[in-house]
Structure formats: C-alpha cells, structure tokens
Amino acid sequence: CFHQTKKGLVLSCVVAFLMISARKQMVIALAMLAVCILVRGIRSRNAGRSVALLAVCAAGVLGGSTLLDLGYNYVVRQDAVRHSSDGRFITTMAFYTAERSDAAYIEDEEIRELFLQIYDACDEQGYLKHSAGKGWLNRVEHFGDSYDCIQIDTMWPAVNAFVRERYGEDDVVLSEHADRIMGVINVSVLPHNLGKLTASFLDNFLSGLITTVAQRNPVLNWYSLVAYCVYLLLFLWNLWVGKNRRVLQIGGLVLLSIFFNVGLVSLVIFCQTRYTIYNMALFYIALILMLNEWWKARSF
C-alpha cells in the first residue's frame, strides 16, 4: 500500500473489511491503512489527494462492515440493526474505577439505583480498583481477575434483568435499552474518574507490550524489555544506516501496529495474550529481517 497501486489498495481495503467484520478490535487494520496512505501522500507531496482517498477507503470499509452487521441481524433476527452491547467494555471500566459517591452524577433515579446495586455487589467481592494491591504486577493481575467477574458475573445479568422487568423479552428491544443504560452510566461516571482510567490504561499498556512478545512473569518481563530495546536499536540502525527501505517500512509498521493494538485493548479490557498475540509473529519476523540487514552490512 506504500506504493499505492490500485490492486494493492483494493486488496488492503478488502483485508481490512474482513478483519473488522471478524473482530471489531481489528479496526487497527484500517488505522494502519490510513498511515500507509497518508505517508505515501506526504512523500509524493500530494496530501490532499491522499486525504480524499483515505476518506473513500474508510467509508467503503466501515460502510461495508455496517451493511454486513445489518444484513446478518436481518437474516438471524428479522431486524436490520447494528451489532449491540459493544459499550459493555467501557461500562466495565466505569465500574472498575468508580467510587460509590459517583452514583450522584447519574440523573435517572432508576439507573442510579441499578448502578448502586451492581457497584455494591462488585465492591463486596473486592472486584474494584481500590481493592487492588500495591505495585504494578498486583494491579494488573487484580484487574485481569476482576474484569469478567464485573462484566459477565455481575453487571450483565443485572442490566438484563432490569431491562426485562421493564421492557419485556424481545432480544432487539433488550439490547437497545441495555445499550442506552450503559451509555448513561458511561457518560455520567467516566468523566469524573479520568485519572484512575489513565492509570489503569498505562498499567494495561505495559502489560500488553509484554504479552505481545512473551508472557507476563518476573523473568519474561525483563526479557520483553531487552527484546524491545534490541528491536528499537535495529530499527534506528536501519533508519540511519540501512539501505533496504522495505525492511525499514515493515519494522515501523509492525511497531505502530503493536502500539495501536495494545492501546486499543488497554482502553477497554485487560491485555490477555489472546488480544495481543496478533502481532507476536510479526514482531519476531521484523526483528529477524532488521537483524539480517545489520548482519549483512557488518559482514562486508
């Protein structure tokens, strides 16, 4: 896509569409496509054309994904609606970082009572951030252990019961009202806990960098640090000394992809390996390619 052939651009859009349709986390594929198009535009001094091209590609990929969602739900549920409940990840973060006093920010009395019901159940079990131990590793492990307990075991059943009691059993109606309720909680509570959200994000981001290249344990944590240092040194060498621009491009795109993916995951969920492993093979392939360029230059 750096060379922006029509075939390469169309293929990149198709791949991005398929990846996003399979897993919404793969919106990073569209972000990487955007980087390639914009870099190409800057290099060719035709930024305006690249921005327009990016807009067309993004509209095509996201529009196609939306149509697929609508079509799937129409076939399965006989109702053309978007995929629902994506906001539950953000709401889980809202509960994890909240304090009981944050209920005062929710204006709707019924939703406020629901918030307190879920909050008290989570707090009693020690699922919330203020129950985490001291130190980075304890915080990360507590968040990972608590996340599904908050969302799957506590919040989701309570929200579903709340909606069914008031709006009936229809799945589409249930999903719409559940999304609305979680949206109210998110908008009301999250802005008052930005500091704790940022702290959790940074903890998760570091954890995600580790689980991208290894596993999280006292020995491999240090290995991960060494691996990233070696990668960055080789990348800088290829930037300043190396002659193979394709290897440099691969190294840079893989690094950007890791940052995008880990950043996105860290915002909404804990960085377990199944969310970060997508870039593991790419990391080591790029590392070997850059190491090979350095070795060939050293050999002559």
Regions found by a protein language model. Give the residues of each.
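Membrane-interface transmembrane helices that cradle and orient dolichyl/undecaprenyl
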Residues: 1-8, 298
